[in-house]
Amino acid sequence: MTAILSQKVLRQMAFRWLAPSQSHHPLTIHTDTTDFFKIEYNDVVVLNSKPYLIRHNAREGRFGLDDEVKFWVKRAIDLKTGNLKIIKLVFYERFKTRIGGIEFECFRSPKKEARILDVVNGHSNFMHGYSIEDKEGNIVRVLDYIFGKSLHAYIGDLNMDHHTYFYNFFPDILRNFMKCIEAIRFLHQHAEKHGDIRRDHILIDRDSGRYRWIDFDFNYRHRENIYGYDLFGLGNVLIFLVGMGDVLLLDLKNQDHPALGELREEDVNIVFNNRVANLKKIYPYIPESLNRVLMHFSKGTNWFYENTTQLLDDLREFKMLV
């Protein structure tokens, strides 16, 4: 196939997504994705003879970072099927973080995410896709697009008092989140870890209603418990769900909340010290069996969960008692 014919065929395939003013202009074609800043809207990325029409860059969707562009993550159209995809290009970063005196070295690993996509193929609580190398050997991940909002956004959109939420909505949310914990256990049983567990990394699938994990490309090193960072992440999400959002010390102070005087240093989140983990002091109707679970992720804990089974067992005990 000549370059001219290739351009002609690609324009025919992309015609319905191109503006009339662009339908006769040559398309920029990329087979090397190393410099992802050069890959722009309406360009075509070709991977193993399969063309993808690039749409917008993805954006960070949490904690006021809605405008932070992720230039290495692109929305794209599979021009052979017309399906919407997410294309993740190779991007490396590395940092260290400390939780409760434990240091973790974190880094992005496209190879690790590619492995996990194979492991979780067909598992209903994970995103799906495949990896492929471009002509320069970059590991590109092509992901099925999940229609639906994040768990973070879903909780943030709820408009009710906490008591109503806790008794009428939280039980079903917890049931679904426990399936997410079971999914992380599945990963750990396969000697893999998620690496970046956050509430905006769970999408609620609009079609199935299932909670699905996304973004597995972070990895971390820690000598004592290789799954510890995942467990701290699960605890942060659980505290967020029980509280119907973050319970912040500053908000309590601004509200002159009566519980503020009862809070101690050991009652805050071990990772985020401006958030309350001991939620029973804020909402006294939270059962002690559930609050005990939360306190394992507090600054005052003297015992950390070592695996997801321990966490699931305690949550099941809470469910049996209510």
Task: Locate predicted features.
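C-lobe/activation-segment region of protein kinase-like
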Residues: 211-293
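Activation segment signature within eukaryotic-like protein kinase domains
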Residues: 176-177
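Catalytic-loop of the protein kinase fold
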Residues: 184-204
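A conserved short helix/loop substructure at the end of the activation segment
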Residues: 298-310
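Conserved HxN/HPN-centered segment at the entrance to the catalytic loop
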Residues: 115-133
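Juxta-kinase regulatory segment immediately upstream of eukaryotic protein kinase catalytic domains
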Residues: 2-64
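Conserved structural core of kinase catalytic domains
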Residues: 127-168
